[in-house]
Amino acid sequence: MEAYKKEFIEFMIECGVLTFGDFVTKSGRKTPFFVNTGNYKTGSQLKRLGEYYAEAIKANYKDDYNIVFGPAYKGIPLSVTVTMALSDKYGIDVSYCSNRKEVKDHGDTGILLGSKLNDGDKVLIVEDVTTSGKSIYETMPIIKEQGNVDVVGLVISVNRMEKGQGEKSALVELEEKYGFKSCAIVTMTEVVEYLYNKEVNGKVIINDEIKTRIDEYYKEYGAK
């Protein structure tokens, strides 16, 4: 496993973003782990988050994009910090773009924030976590309505590796529907592999009991 992946897993634990216990997802699934990206709150945390995304982007995509798009709402600050990190770390200077939930009818009108989307633009979408893919299904029509725009990829922080609308994962379903490449900074398989019986800040994060519960969860909800 690459060093940046290990660092990112510990970073999520330190920020209280990745936790283990008893949770219920929006879809009603009882899950033994939860990823709450709303816990990235400080400037230093957001800066580091952008850097991890930039590393994943650099590892998985050529420089064949000119817009980083973050779906509202969490994707708005995410798209900004990712574009800054790409510039700082790799000298890749691209624009950010996000959508509003409501169309603005005064001042800077329209549904987009940041850069406008024009014919020929190549867009890389950044999202926090995709369980069902709902936000991307909502976002793609907005992007496509702007003109002849090519969406080249989707980058998320954690691939939960769960069933989407069918038996396949949400990311695979999105890839098949829209024809782009997706990637994650880490997968839950990598998270479990790295944290199982490992101490982080003096505490074992995934012990035998939690590991068993995770295994049982994926027997029922894991993507085929």
UniProtKB/Swiss-Prot annotation:
Its recorded reaction(s) are: orotidine 5'-phosphate + diphosphate = orotate + 5-phospho-alpha-D-ribose 1-diphosphate
**What Gene Ontology terms describe what this protein does at the molecular function level?**
magnesium ion binding; orotate phosphoribosyltransferase activity
Determine the domain of life of the protein's source. Bacteria
* Pathway of action: Pyrimidine metabolism; UMP biosynthesis via de novo pathway; UMP from orotate: step 1/2
Q: Which UniProt keywords are listed?
A: Glycosyltransferase, Magnesium, Pyrimidine biosynthesis, Transferase
| The keyword Magnesium is assigned to this record | yes
Q: Which GO terms describe its cellular component?
A: cytoplasm
User: Which positions are annotated as binding orotate?
Assistant: T131, R160
Pfam families the UniProt entry points to: Pribosyltran
Q: Cite the EC number.
A: 2.4.2.10
- Presence of the UniProt keyword Glycosyltransferase in the record: yes
Which residues does UniProt assign to the signal peptide? none
Cofactor(s) needed by this chain: Mg(2+)
Q: Which InterPro entries match?
A: OPRT, Or_phspho_trans_dom, PRibTrfase_dom, PRTase-like
In this chain, 5-phospho-alpha-D-ribose 1-diphosphate is annotated as bound at 26, 73-74, 100-101, 104, 106, 127-135
Would you kindly state one Gene Ontology biological process term found in this protein's UniProt entry?
'de novo' pyrimidine nucleobase biosynthetic process
- What CDD domains does the record tag this protein with? PRTases_typeI (cd06223)
Top enzyme category: transferase
Q: Which protein family is it in?
A: Belongs to the purine/pyrimidine phosphoribosyltransferase family. PyrE subfamily.
Query: Quaternary structure per UniProt?
Result: Homodimer.
Q: What does this protein do?
A: Catalyzes the transfer of a ribosyl phosphate group from 5-phosphoribose 1-diphosphate to orotate, leading to the formation of orotidine monophosphate (OMP).
| The name this protein goes by in its record | Orotate phosphoribosyltransferase
